[in-house]
């Protein structure tokens, strides 16, 4: 394994498997706090501008060298706030999404924890056509977290001035909305609707990925690799 970039909120590596003869590129977000040289302390499960930029260049490199890509997701999304905007999160995030969405090499995604919002897209969610999407049994798959989503839906439903409800009714409505969202974020809900290809035991991940790579890496894709305009 050659460590292409670590010490960031996203880690990308090249790895060669002697038993299969396959080399692959791995992209995964960190689930621990990281001390970045450029932007200080970075929180776990969030994509920052420097790591998005580095990952985008790594994905471009894998496409040039025709390396299959494996993404591991446990991500809440991109970092927000004034400091994140000053660091160029919009430009770097767009570059990462551009690189992932236009990749022509085989892509495989494994959801090992949460997969929320734009982070799902950045690490090759369903919309960007990975050859396979696998998930661990504990995985969550949604636009945003249950607390935030239930607040948004609750506000919309109670905005009608003609609908008068007692405090008890409002509390019951909020609780129902949140529970519905929790149920629908469960990976079994998504798997039943074809959002993932299989729910796999964590200890079988290696064997499943080796089989998936053997299926996905051949034949070589014929499409050329072309990205949109990238801001540098």
Identify the function of each model-found stretch:
Residues 1-232:
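Ligand-binding clefts of soluble mixed alpha/beta catalytic domains
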């Amino acid at each position: 394994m050659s460590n292409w970039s670590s010490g960031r909120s996203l880690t990308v590596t090249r790895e060669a498997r002697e038993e299969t003869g396959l080399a692959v590129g791995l992209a995964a977000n960190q689930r621990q706090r990281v001390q970045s040289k450029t932007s200080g302390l970075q929180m776990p499960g969030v994509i920052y501008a420097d790591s998005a930029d580095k990952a985008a260049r790594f994905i471009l490199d894998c496409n040039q060298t025709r390396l299959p890509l494996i993404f591991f997701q446990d991500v809440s999304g991109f970092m927000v706030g004034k400091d994140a905007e000053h660091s160029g999160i919009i430009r770097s995030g767009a570059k990462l999404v551009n690189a992932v969405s236009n990749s022509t090499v085989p892509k495989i995604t494994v959801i090992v924890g949460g997969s929320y919002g734009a982070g799902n897209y950045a690490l090759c969610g369903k919309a960007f056509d990975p050859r396979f999407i696998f998930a661990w049994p504990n995985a969550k798959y949604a636009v945003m977290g249950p607390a935030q989503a239930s607040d948004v839906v609750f506000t919309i439903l109670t905005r009608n001035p003609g609908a008068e409800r007692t405090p008890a009714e409002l509390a019951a409505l909020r609780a129902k909305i949140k529970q519905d969202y929790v149920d629908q974020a469960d990976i079994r809900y998504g798997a039943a609707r074809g959002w993932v290809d299989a729910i796999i035991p964590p200890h079988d991940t290696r064997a499943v990925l080796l089989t998936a790579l053997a299926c996905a890496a051949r034949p070589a894709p014929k499409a050329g690799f072309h990205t949109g305009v990238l801001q540098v």
